[in-house]
Amino acid sequence: MSIYVASTTAPVNIATLKYWGKRDSMLNLPTNSSISVTLSQEDLRTLTSAATGPELAEDRLWLNGKPESLGNARTQQCLADLRALRRALETEEPDLPRMSEWKLHIVSENNFPTAAGLASSAAGFAALVVAVAKLYGLPQDYSEISKIARKGSGSACRSLYGGYVAWEMGAEADGSDSRAVQIADVEHWPEMRAAILVVSADRKDTPSTSGMQQTVHTSDLFKERVATVVPRRYGEMAAAIRARDFATFARLTMQDSNSFHATCLDSFPPIFYMNDTSRRIVKLCHLINEFYNETIVAYTFDAGPNAVLYYLAENEARLCGFLSAVFGANDGWETTFSTEQRATFAAQFDECVRGKLATDLDDELHRGVARLIFTKVGPGPQDTKSSLIDPETGLPR
């Protein structure tokens, strides 16, 4: 068999300025621009291999070891766009293999729970589009390719870059200017860290796609959000990132998370993505910032109960002292921190905090958290020698 294979990894991104609402559902065009931080693939990534060859009988997809349908319209649109770009390449260079006419096998795996509020669809579609683009040898840059990923999952376009990324909503009806751009790369502000508190790994009650359209059609707060609040915050947050101004970045991140969830609550019927554990984590973050009399941690919640806490490396001991006091018995610490580091966090809390708080810590909060994931800002899609496809058969290894 003549099988061609290409593989890539793609990252999770977590928005600090939220995308919520579509002005065109078919093209996945947003009602507002958004900003995100790309997270390290050492901790959260999708690995995707794509294969093609004249002998493959049909397009097929395997996700986390199981066959999945490739029939949904979004995936089909992504593949059609990629094939169109490959076809144009073949027209220019007639000696190229006619890959645009051949079927595709795509094998993908996540190292985190799928559809659990950890932006799995973003990493998944980004990896799919980049792997096929690599397989096809497409010359387009990632900003162009991001417009295809956007059609699969809106936030996927932001996973085509590392560091700090904006999805520009654009103005054109055909979506030709709705794409991802990089605000700053990893090296610009490498000290950014993230702690993910996994509140639930279950599927969401209200999927993002249906939830956001419910908000668009029924929320009065949403209209104010997209008209004035987000455009103002977009400029302020981009400037804070460029200036490495954590206090401003953190305040805007928390305010925008609150604004997003307020529009969900203002939808009719209301949509609840945060739960009691989520809200208690918000209170904990404000308690920490008030104790130190400075903003050292920022929370944000996507369309789910999981919390993402942003902080700088210089404040790791101060923040993790609090987190270890509350979540010290939860899983996840051992993946990132040594026993000595954890002892340092506990000592920091005992020396600087214990007995000095105006209110007691929430002794029950840890029960609502399944595990913690500690990570940091990271790069965009990466080439990899790892392959999930057997080049002899075109099937999963």
From Swiss-Prot:
Coiled coil regions in record: none
Catalysed reactions, semicolon-separated: (R)-5-diphosphomevalonate + ATP = isopentenyl diphosphate + ADP + phosphate + CO2
Keyword vocabulary terms for this entry: ATP-binding, Lipid biosynthesis, Lipid metabolism, Lyase, Nucleotide-binding, Steroid biosynthesis, Steroid metabolism, Sterol biosynthesis, Sterol metabolism
GO biological process per UniProt: isopentenyl diphosphate biosynthetic process, mevalonate pathway; sterol biosynthetic process
One GO MF term attached to the UniProt entry: ATP binding
Binding site for (R)-5-diphosphomevalonate: Y19, W20, G21, K22, R74, S153, G154, S155, A156, C157, R158, T209
Transmembrane portions of the chain: none
EC class of the enzyme, as a word: lyase
Region annotation Disordered: where it falls in the sequence: 378-397
InterPro entries: GHMP_kinase_C_sf, Mev_decarb, Mev_diP_decarb, MVD-like_N, Mvd1_C, Ribosomal_Su5_D2-typ_SF, Ribsml_uS5_D2-typ_fold_subgr
Pathway annotation: Isoprenoid biosynthesis; isopentenyl diphosphate biosynthesis via mevalonate pathway; isopentenyl diphosphate from (R)-mevalonate: step 3/3
EC number: 4.1.1.33
Source organism, top-level taxon: Eukaryota
One GO cellular component term noted in the UniProt record for this chain: cytosol
SUPFAM superfamilies in the cross-refs: GHMP Kinase, C-terminal domain, Ribosomal protein S5 domain 2-like
Entry-linked PANTHER family: DIPHOSPHOMEVALONATE DECARBOXYLASE
Complex and partners: Homodimer.
UniProt similarity note: Belongs to the diphosphomevalonate decarboxylase family.
NCBIfam families noted in UniProt: mevDPdecarb
Protein purpose: Diphosphomevalonate decarboxylase; part of the second module of ergosterol biosynthesis pathway that includes the middle steps of the pathway. The second module is carried out in the vacuole and involves the formation of farnesyl diphosphate, which is also an important intermediate in the biosynthesis of ubiquinone, dolichol, heme and prenylated proteins. Activity by the mevalonate kinase ERG12 first converts mevalonate into 5-phosphomevalonate. 5-phosphomevalonate is then further converted to 5-diphosphomevalonate by the phosphomevalonate kinase ERG8.
UniProt-recorded name of the protein: Diphosphomevalonate decarboxylase
Gene that this polypeptide is encoded by: MVD1
